[in-house]
Amino acid sequence: MNTVRVTFLLVFVLAVSLRQADKDENRMEMQEKTEQGKSYLDFAENLLLQKLEELEAKLLEEDSEESRNSRQKRCIGEGVPCDENDPRCCSGLVCLKPTLHGIWYKSYYCYKK
């Protein structure tokens, strides 16, 4: 009976120690894989960040060009001389030949429609 207990105890201790060794080995493998994964993730993160910065720079460049080109030109107010070929009268005004005043200064002025 004693030999059965000793044998059982020996097998039990051996199984526990092997299981512990397997756990340690698995833990080391997992740690190595996570370290490799972290380096890969860092590389991927840096690459993505670089691409996003390039995209942001392009978008900001387009926005600045667009805002420069789309700025509304200054318009000429009512009763101000204008050019017949290039009228820059504000909205609601038309470049017309004056009826009485201003005939001697310039030939066209901005008037209400």
Curated annotation (Swiss-Prot):
Q: Does the keyword Secreted apply?
A: yes
Q: What residues make up the propeptide removed on maturation?
A: 22-74
Q: Where is the signal peptide?
A: 1-21
Q: Where is this region: Disordered?
A: 61-83
Q: Which UniProt keywords apply?
A: Disulfide bond, Ion channel impairing toxin, Knottin, Secreted, Signal, Toxin
Q: List the disulfide bonds.
A: 75-90, 82-95, 89-110
The molecular function terms of the Gene Ontology recorded here are: sodium channel inhibitor activity; toxin activity
Tissue specificity, in the record's words, reads: Expressed by the venom gland.
List cellular component terms (GO).
extracellular region
Compartment list:
Secreted
Q: Does the keyword Signal apply?
A: yes
The family database entries (InterPro entries) matched by this protein are listed as:
Toxin_22 (IPR012627)
Transmembrane ranges?
Answer: none
| Similarity field | Belongs to the neurotoxin 14 (magi-1) family. 01 (HNTX-16) subfamily.
Could you tell me what this protein does? Probable ion channel inhibitor.
Q: What is known of its domains?
A: The presence of a 'disulfide through disulfide knot' structurally defines this protein as a knottin.
- Report the protein name in the record: U11-theraphotoxin-Hhn1a
| Source organism per UniProt | Cyriopagopus hainanus (Chinese bird spider)
